Curated annotation (Swiss-Prot):
GO molecular function: ATP binding; histidine-tRNA ligase activity
Protein name from the UniProt record: Histidine--tRNA ligase
HAMAP family assigned: His_tRNA_synth (MF_00127)
InterPro entries in the cross-refs: aa-tRNA-synth_II (IPR006195), aa-tRNA-synth_II/BPL/LPL (IPR045864), Anticodon-bd (IPR004154), Anticodon-bd_dom_sf (IPR036621), His-tRNA-ligase (IPR015807), HisRS-like_core (IPR041715), HisRS/HisZ (IPR004516), HisRS_anticodon (IPR033656)
Pfam family, one: HGTP_anticodon
GO CC term (a single one): cytoplasm
GO annotation (BP), single: histidyl-tRNA aminoacylation
NCBIfam families linked to this entry: hisS
Gene3D superfamilies: Anticodon-binding domain, Bira Bifunctional Protein, Domain 2
EC code: 6.1.1.21
Subunit structure: Homodimer.
Chief location category: cytoplasm
Amino acid sequence: MGTIQTLPGTRDILPEEIGYWQYVETVATQILSRAMYYEIRPPIFEQTSLFERGIGEATDVVGKEMYTFSDRGDRSLTLRPEGTAGVVRAYLQNNLYAAGGVQRLWYCGPMFRYERPQAGRQRQFHQIGLELIGTADPRADVEVIALATDILKTLGLQSLKLDINSVGDRNDRQNYREALVNYFLPYKAELDTDSQDRLQRNPLRILDSKDKRTKEINQNAPSILEHLGDASKKHFDQVQQLLTDLGIEYNINPCLVRGLDYYTHTAFEMISDDLGAQATVCGGGRYDGLVEELGGNPTPAVGWAIGMERLIILLKQLQSSPDMTPDIYIVSRGEAAEGQGLILAQKLRKEGLTVELDMSGSAFGKQFKRADRSGAIACIVLGEEEATNKTVQLKWLQSKEQQAMTQAELLTKVGELIEQLDRHKRTMNHSTQ
């Protein structure tokens, strides 16, 4: 009987990779916390109507990509395909607006879409996202862009391109939709199949087509920027000026429309050419009509989401990985020594040291080889003699220096030990540069 495998479009995140994920989450948490964004954790599945109303029934996400099922109460439920709709639902259901002012929220977790799996695109994928709800001020648009930039640059990504556009307000978009339909109709037979389907349903998405002939037709399509009203133009001009004031470089891309119906005014993407076809690492924009669409009062908002799988592909290319090696590796042999090793490991961990305890029970020679491979700075050795005398041998793995001490001395000198570990780390780092 064969082993059970993961489903297409899903994958295990294994221990050797998890350090990247924890690194990204830690950096994002630190930066967003400093900007007074609070984490929120909505459910992974919601009523299907939330996404039909929030994302738009005419979108590819709702029409083709959602994982939808009926539960035993015959309710239609959907695994969330994105995070914003659930956050807005939570904002309304839990009266987060009652405090007044703006709400700064962020989330992290898995999303689900039925797509063709490829590098950087999975059917279960993960996002870090934020939402700034309650203000139409262009400074909010720029604040969230600046925070995404800070996160990505702190992680070591420097060669990113920021594309921005304005998709205007509802009236602007309606006028633009009509202009697009009139432009594309004579070319209908030349458009790819998906774009033909989108022509009446969601013509803005034709601008995002990857088909070669459709892209050629798009080159002469009307620009959304030519259909913006005065208020939309003013908002977009202010966003550009504020980005310039912050020293954030950007490129205006009139074809940038994003894939969800709720976007208004500013839309943006952060792009890396290192990812091939799946180039967008972060995408977002303003969605001033979504709160009202989901039953609330008219409330402006802006947000983004970072795709973690794509981001981690980039981090691996940069070899930008956190240090996941132990400070100390404990080897022991014999029942009494192994028990004392466990106790020492726990006590040293409580003092803030990273400790790996060898539990193989194999000969010292094999344990020492594993200690060398672990990347640890020092090794604590416990044999039968050490167990009897309540002593240890502390061995520095790079210099091979070794010193004997009692277990009590080891624990009382943890501060000195940490200083010694730091010195050895600096020596090792210097020798590898």
